[in-house]
């Protein structure tokens, strides 16, 4: 969602407008669109994660998933993370992206996990609920209760409804 970061750190040259237009083109067709996002990149701030959320709010997709960055060995970003002291060169990145392995001072693991957990809520629910979604990011009793309530709202309002397919099964 942050063009400058994507261009310099991820070496992606597509503009935000090109991404939005491509997603809208797919949405206008009969092709289902699943958007896979990543948060928790090295030096990424909460504001930059929200640039990605804002980008996702500008087009329709059948699903908006979110993973947490992992510095896989042999990649440019792995070398960058080791050089910055965010990750030990002998450590292996996890295959599952439930937590950030990076040791960064500007953002906590819990904050990255919270944004990733609530990503779909942030992309679909109205902005006037963002303060409640932020509560749902927390892994305490209040946060868990808020998350359950917001997920009920999300599922009843935005989640695709189950429909029968040709084979007689159910697809969601």
Predicted regions span which residues?
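Residue-level signal for pocket-adjacent positions within structured domains
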Residues: 4-5, 64, 72, 97, ...
């Amino acid at each position: 969602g942050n063009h400058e970061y994507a261009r310099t750190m991820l070496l992606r040259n597509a503009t935000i407008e090109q991404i939005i237009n491509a997603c809208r083109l797919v949405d206008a067709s009969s092709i289902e669109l699943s958007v896979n996002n990543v948060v928790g990149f090295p030096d990424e701030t909460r504001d930059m994660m929200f640039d990605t959320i804002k980008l996702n709010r500008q087009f329709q997709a059948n699903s908006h998933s979110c993973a947490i960055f992992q510095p896989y060995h042999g990649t440019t970003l792995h070398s960058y993370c080791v050089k910055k002291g965010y990750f030990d060169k002998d450590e292996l990145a996890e295959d599952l992206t439930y937590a950030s392995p990076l040791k960064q001072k500007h953002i906590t693991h819990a904050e990255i996990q919270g944004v990733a957990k609530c990503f779909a809520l942030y992309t679909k629910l109205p902005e006037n609920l963002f303060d409640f979604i932020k509560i749902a990011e927390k892994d305490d009793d209040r946060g868990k209760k808020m998350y359950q309530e917001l997920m009920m709202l999300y599922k009843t309002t935005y989640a695709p409804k189950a429909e029968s397919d040709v084979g007689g099964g159910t697809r969601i």
